[in-house]
């Protein structure tokens, strides 16, 4: 009789690995996790472009109803503000206007709005003094794309 080179312990480990792999793979295909990931990526990309003063590029993340106003204020932003540091302090999630429960796994499913609180260290010309501003960015889910509704006035005060 032929004897297998694989020990029962090794076979159990391989099966356990495959089960874990399939479990994790299924989670990444879940639209809920995709929504969360898309929000995170949109926040990072917009703020990187915004802080780099690439206003025309960052405008792709601005809600269409607010894009014209954003572009109108962009010249003043690029001329007067120098960013030194930005830190995301908090993200609150909402589903149809109602706050959702957030656990260690993240917010509950179905959220379609988020409020991101960011602390900026910046200088606003003509002053060269470093100031701190707390800004709330409102993000809304439009179809499958997250869009920001920016309020630049808090930065220009």
Language-model segments: residues:
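Short, low-complexity N-terminal intrinsically disordered segments enriched in polar/charged residues
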Residues: 25-52
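Exposed beta-sheet edge and beta->alpha loop/turn motif
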Residues: 98-157
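Glycine-centered loop/turn positions within well-structured domains
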Residues: 24, 56, 146
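N-terminal secretory signal peptides that target proteins for export/translocation
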Residues: 1-10
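Bacterial N-terminal signal peptides
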Residues: 13-23
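Short solvent-exposed beta->alpha transition segments
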Residues: 40, 55-103, 111
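Structured segments of extracytoplasmic/periplasmic soluble domains
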Residues: 45-53, 61-65, 80, 142-145
